[in-house]
C-alpha cells in the first residue's frame, strides 16, 4: 500500500467529521467538521479539503449495530461514499465504524470532562478513529 495521505469521514445528517492520516505512522489527526443539511454535504467545502490535502484515498465510516444490523444511516453513508468516488475520482474505502463515536466521546471526556464534549469535535475525532482503524487494518 502506498505511503501517502488519506482522509477519513464520519458521515452524519447534520455534520460530517473529517480527519487526515498517513500510512507511515498509521496515525490520524482530526481536521474539521463539515456542515450537512438533511444529509446533503457541503460539497464545496469537501472539494477544498481534498484539494488542500491531495489524498490517495478516502475512508468513510459505515454505521452498523453491535449485532451487525444496519442502521438508518448505513445506506446514507454508502451513498455519500459513492458520491465521493463519483465527484473526485478517488478510491473510497468503507470501514465498520461501530462505537467510533463512543470512543471519541471517551477521548474528549479524558481531556477535560463533559465540558470538552462538543458535537463538532466528537465528529472529527470519530473520523480520526475510523481512519486510524483503516490504516492499521490495511498494513
Curated annotation (Swiss-Prot):
Entry-linked NCBIfam families: RNAse_H_YqgF (TIGR00250)
Organism this protein belongs to: Legionella pneumophila (strain Paris)
Protein localization: Cytoplasm
Major enzyme class: hydrolase
GO molecular function, one term: nuclease activity
InterPro entries, sorted: RNaseH-like_sf, YqgF, YqgF/RNaseH-like_dom, YqgF/RNaseH-like_dom_sf
Name of the molecule in the record: Putative pre-16S rRNA nuclease
Record-annotated disulphide pairs: none
The entry's keywords: Cytoplasm, Hydrolase, Nuclease, Ribosome biogenesis
GO terms under biological process: rRNA 5'-end processing
GO CC annotations on file: cytosol
Role: Could be a nuclease involved in processing of the 5'-end of pre-16S rRNA.
Amino acid at each position: 500500500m502506498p505511503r501517502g495521505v488519506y482522509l477519513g469521514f464520519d458521515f452524519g445528517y447534520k455534520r460530517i467529521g473529517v480527519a487526515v492520516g498517513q500510512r507511515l505512522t498509521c496515525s490520524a489527526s482530526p481536521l474539521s467538521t463539515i456542515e450537512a443539511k438533511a444529509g446533503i454535504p457541503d460539497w464545496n467545502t469537501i472539494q477544498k479539503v481534498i484539494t488542500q490535502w491531495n489524498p490517495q484515498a478516502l475512508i468513510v465510516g459505515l454505521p452498523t449495530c453491535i449485532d451487525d444490523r444496519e442502521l438508518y444511516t448505513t445506506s446514507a453513508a454508502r451513498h455519500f461514499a459513492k458520491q465521493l468516488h463519483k465527484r473526485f475520482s478517488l478510491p473510497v474505502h468503507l470501514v465498520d465504524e461501530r462505537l467510533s463515536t463512543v470512543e471519541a466521546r471517551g477521548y474528549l471526556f479524558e481531556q477535560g470532562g463533559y465540558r470538552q464534549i462538543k458535537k463538532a469535535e466528537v465528529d472529527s475525532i470519530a473520523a480520526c478513529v475510523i481512519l486510524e482503524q483503516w490504516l492499521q487494518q490495511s498494513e
